[in-house]
Amino acid sequence: MGIGNENKGFITASADALINWVRTGSLWPVTTGLACCAVEMMHAGAARYDLDRFGIVFRPSPRQSDVLIVAGTLCNKMAPALRQVYDQMPDPKWVISMGSCANGGGYYHYSYSVVRGCDRIIPVDIYVPGCPPTAEALVYGIIQLQNKIIRKDTIARK
């Protein structure tokens, strides 16, 4: 009816739902353990919280991953390497910023060598607060990322 009105067809809407459902069940993160938050990230991947039940398998290579978890303090010298890892990931890709230091610099905010948030280097989809955030907080952040992926239009033109 109006200029901004978009009608997605049945096939497009169904394919979007199917593709996004499949993506949420097979998130493969590459990890950047920059500080103490990495310990909690490993804790989340261990037996008690078992991220495998969500279809999350940690990958050693960014070329095999679709989620980047930035866990810890990002220093100025590490920023180009983080950007390179992000650029090597295939599309679609998502980023989780884990911990106060990755979110905004944390305790080291006023240090000369710290990037005040990894969102200055790469686009961030989900922020997990805390110093360090618990494994439950990371699991909750991953569930929020899955909800964000489900709501995304994959094939429909905008």
Swiss-Prot record:
GO terms for biological process: aerobic respiration; electron transport coupled proton transport. It is a peripheral membrane protein. One of its GO terms (cellular component) is plasma membrane. Keywords: 4Fe-4S, Cell inner membrane, Cell membrane, Iron, Iron-sulfur, Membrane, Metal-binding, NAD, Quinone, Translocase, Transport, Ubiquinone. It comes from the Bacteria. It catalyses: a quinone + NADH + 5 H(+)(in) = a quinol + NAD(+) + 4 H(+)(out). Its EC number is 7.1.1.-. It is found in: Cell inner membrane. Its cofactor is [4Fe-4S] cluster. GO terms for molecular function: 4 iron, 4 sulfur cluster binding; iron ion binding; NADH dehydrogenase (ubiquinone) activity; NADH:ubiquinone reductase (non-electrogenic) activity; quinone binding. Binds 1 [4Fe-4S] cluster. Gene3D superfamilies: 3.40.50.12280. Belongs to the complex I 20 kDa subunit family. NDH-1 is composed of 14 different subunits. Subunits NuoB, C, D, E, F, and G constitute the peripheral sector of the complex. NDH-1 shuttles electrons from NADH, via FMN and iron-sulfur (Fe-S) centers, to quinones in the respiratory chain. The immediate electron acceptor for the enzyme in this species is believed to be ubiquinone. Couples the redox reaction to proton translocation (for every two electrons transferred, four hydrogen ions are translocated across the cytoplasmic membrane), and thus conserves the redox energy in a proton gradient. PANTHER family: NADH DEHYDROGENASE, NADH DEHYDROGENASE [UBIQUINONE] IRON-SULFUR PROTEIN 7, MITOCHONDRIAL. This is NADH-quinone oxidoreductase subunit B. It comes from Francisella philomiragia subsp. philomiragia (strain ATCC 25017 / CCUG 19701 / FSC 153 / O#319-036).
